[in-house]
């Protein structure tokens, strides 16, 4: 997206309000060739009603056929080119827990995991240990690990996830992940991807060596993996690009982090999906763009729990009337990527998308699902970068281009 093209077209006196409701990992697959996806299986009368008044399609955020990570996928939804604006998961996780990243910091996202006697990963999430156990393990590592010449920060994120930060001179984030992102494999050795990152890579290798020795008798979290090494980027801000006063409502730190890195106001984490809508209602008069994030669709997909994912979609559907009661000008319902429970992982499949607005040209499709979206006017593989200009146009916030 050409930000310089958009900026002069923004209407200064525009009032239209936009809600971007993201069900993480929404896209799915049928378990059998003649079956339905999770979204198609779910009973969603409220979303189906909106679909009959909306424009539908399937989007992708990164080059077609490539599986996106969560951070890059969300950047696409926010109108940033995910390939140009690449960011490590560590920065997003650090910002998501309100860690104040400095100019000499490099962050990574950590997972406590379970390995066998040969160092082969048997559970990438260590049984989804509770956050309190993650805090204990972080404290244990901080207390015993010694890395001369740098400051080490370890903070729990949520459940098995933690944030790793090194602070010091001459650190560079171009270090390869130790996380193979699969069971049945050993952790990778951290390698510098550029010569200037060799110091950082050596520190990571030493951290891993000491940390594994400390955790070897713990159970189930007897090891850890790291990914997404990066420092804080300097990017154009979301509100400046789109002429909006945005706010993010998200429970999980990583998604709060991606909102922070683009300059959104981020509200305190809610305890449930219903409380997220409570926040939407509370702050409705203070903002004009609302990013509302639902995590559990992705979590159940990664766990291979088809019925659990269906249930969460149905819970979200039950909240739709509360959103519509606020009288938004535009409501976009979509996901950041697909996480089919059949695959237990992110996938390359396109993501169902609905743009409901007071100015929509309805497609006349009376359901919201992957195959219904195939018939929609937005197309079967439109670019996620197009969502923000479409949202602003539907909200009557953009002037015409050209004479």
Tell me the role of every PLM-derived stretch.
Residues 1-403:
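Feature captures the catalytic ectodomains and active-site-proximal regions of enzymes
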């Amino acid at each position: 997206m050409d930000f310089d093209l958009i900026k002069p077209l923004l209407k200064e006196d525009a009032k239209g309000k936009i809600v971007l409701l993201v069900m993480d990992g929404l896209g799915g697959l049928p378990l059998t060739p003649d079956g339905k996806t999770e979204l198609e299986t779910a009973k969603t009368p409220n979303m189906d009603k909106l679909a009959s008044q909306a424009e539908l399609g399937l989007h992708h955020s990164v080059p077609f056929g490539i599986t996106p990570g969560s951070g890059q996928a969300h950047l696409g939804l926010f109108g940033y080119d995910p390939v140009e604006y690449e960011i490590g998961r560590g920065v997003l996780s650090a910002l998501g827990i309100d860690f104040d990243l400095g100019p000499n910091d490099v962050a990574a996202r950590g997972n406590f995991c379970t390995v066998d006697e040969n160092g082969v990963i048997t559970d990438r999430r260590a049984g989804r240990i509770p956050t309190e156990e993650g805090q204990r393990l972080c404290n244990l590592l901080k207390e015993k690990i010694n890395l001369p010449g740098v400051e080490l920060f370890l903070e729990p994120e949520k459940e098995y996830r933690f944030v790793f930060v090194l602070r010091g001179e001459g650190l560079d984030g171009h270090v390869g992940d130790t996380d193979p992102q699969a069971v049945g494999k050993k952790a990778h050795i951290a390698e510098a991807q550029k010569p200037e990152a060799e110091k950082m890579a050596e520190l990571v290798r030493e951290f891993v060596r000491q940390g594994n020795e400390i955790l070897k008798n713990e159970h189930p979290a007897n090891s850890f993996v790291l990914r997404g090494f990066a420092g804080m980027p300097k990017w154009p801000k979301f509100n400046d690009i789109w002429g909006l006063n945005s706010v993010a409502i998200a429970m999980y730190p990583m998604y709060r982090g991606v909102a922070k890195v683009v300059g959104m106001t981020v509200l305190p984490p809610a305890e449930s999906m219903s409380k997220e809508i409570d926040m939407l209602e509370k702050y409705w008069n203070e903002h004009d763009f609302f990013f509302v994030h639902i995590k559990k669709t992705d979590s159940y997909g990664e766990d291979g729990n088809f019925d659990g994912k269906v249930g969460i979609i149905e819970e979200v559907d039950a909240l739709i009337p509360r959103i519509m009661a606020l009288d938004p000008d535009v409501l976009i319902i979509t996901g950041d990527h697909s996480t089919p429970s059949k695959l237990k992982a992110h996938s390359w499949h396109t993501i169902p998308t609905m743009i409901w607005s007071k100015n929509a040209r309805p497609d006349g499709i009376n359901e919201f699902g992957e195959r219904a979206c195939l018939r929609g006017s937005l197309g079967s593989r439109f670019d996620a970068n197009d969502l923000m200009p479409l949202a602003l146009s539907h909200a009557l916030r953009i002037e015409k281009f050209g004479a």
